[in-house]
C-alpha cells in the first residue's frame, strides 16, 4: 500500500489568498497556580522593606539622655555589608525582613487632634521587633533530599531593652546556618549563634558579625544534620514524645527544673502532631520517622513563634 499523504485542501490557494494579512500569532494563556511565598518566620509578623524601615519609621531613643538606638534598618544594612564582605565572590541576596508589634505615635503638632482626624503625616510608627534572613544561595548542600542554602538571620527586640535608662550596649541576636529550601525552616547550630550580642555602635556590630562568620564551621553543621537521617523512631515512640511534651507544662515546678526547658507551646506541639500526619515533605504517618524529618517538624512549628524567641527554638544543641 502506498503511503497516504494528506495535503491541506487550501494549500494551492495559500499564496493567492494571503491569509497572513488577517491572521495573528496564537497566544497560549496558561493559568499557573499562585503559590504563597514561604518565609523563615510567618505567624505574628508582617513583611517590611528596608526602604519602609528607613523612611517611614522613627528611631527610638534612650529617654534619660536622648541618645539614639541602633534602629532596625541600620542593623539590617550592617549585617548585609558584613555578609557581602565576608562572602565576597558569592551571591548574597537582599534581606527578607519581618516585623511585629507596631508602636504608634503622633507628631507634637497633632497632640490635640482627635484620632479620627489624624492625617498620615501626623502619625509616627516604629516596630518593637524585627527579624531578617539573608541567603547565600551559591553555598548549599543537600540533606535528606532537601536543598539547604547558607543563611544569616538577625533578630532585634526593643522590649528586651530598658529604653527608659541612659544609653547602654544594645542587645542583638545573630545566627548563621542553613535554610531548608523546601519549607524555609531555619537550621541553626550552637557554633553559629550569638544570643547575647551587645554592642554600642554599628562598627562593633560589623566586627561581631565577621567574627561569628569566621568561627562558624558549616562542614561540621552539615555533618551533624546528615547524621540525623541515620536514626529513626517508631510511631509509638513519636506518640510518647508528643505526650510527654504536652505533660511538661502540668508538672510541678520542682520536676520542671530537673528537666531541660520545654520552649514549644501546646499549640506548636499540636502543629508537630498534625504535620506528622499531613505534611507532604516530613510527615511519616504509619511508618518510622527519621530524626531529620522530626527536626523539620519542630522547626516548622517554630515558624509561629514570636520574633524574640524564634532563634532559641531553631537551635540544635
Regions found by a protein language model. Give the residues of each.
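Histidine (H) residue identity feature
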Residues: 39, 51-55, 72, 101, ...
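Feature for intrinsically disordered/low-complexity regulatory segments and propeptides
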Residues: 1-80, 87, 91, 98
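A generic structural signal for well-ordered alpha-helical segments enriched in polar/charged residues
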Residues: 81, 85, 251-254
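A short acidic/basic microdomain associated with nuclease active sites
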Residues: 85-124, 129-131
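Intrinsically disordered, low-complexity regions enriched in serine/threonine
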Residues: 1-35, 114-316
